[in-house]
Design a protein with these regions (language model features):
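Cys/His-rich short segments
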Residues: 1-12
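Beta-strand scaffold of nucleotide-dependent catalytic cores
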Residues: 11, 21-24
């Protein structure tokens, strides 16, 4: 019997003092801001993957990582796990090969999708 190979990924809404962190990615739609996301590594919990992805892409540390839901992703064999997290420390230091820009947005002033 063959079992499906699934690639789990995480997406996270990072909050700080009432604002939400959104980023524009280097290799995606130029003006589209999204939450941070990435694939889990072998042997890594989803919560640890959230912390690692945020740290790698922005230089920030997060805490209070809470599962919010899941959905199949539009790419073959992928499952997206959504989380909320709170900024814990650090200043933005972007991973230049992945993130073009990241900034904090007031929920009442989010960029258009």
């Amino acid at each position: 019997m063959a079992y499906p190979a699934i690639s789990p990924a995480v997406i996270v809404r990072v909050e700080k003092e009432g604002e939400i962190l959104l980023a524009r990615h280097v290799q995606r739609i130029p003006d589209l801001y999204t939450c941070l996301a990435g694939y889990l590594e072998v042997g890594e919990s989803a919560e640890d993957g959230v912390r690692r992805e945020v740290r790698e892409e922005t230089g920030l540390e997060v805490g209070d990582v809470v599962y919010a839901g899941s959905q199949p992703w539009p790419y073959p064999n992928q499952l997206m796990l959504a989380f909320k997290a709170r900024w814990a420390s650090g200043e933005l230091a972007l991973q230049a090969d992945e993130i073009a820009e990241a900034r904090w947005f007031d929920p009442a002033d989010l960029p258009a999708i």
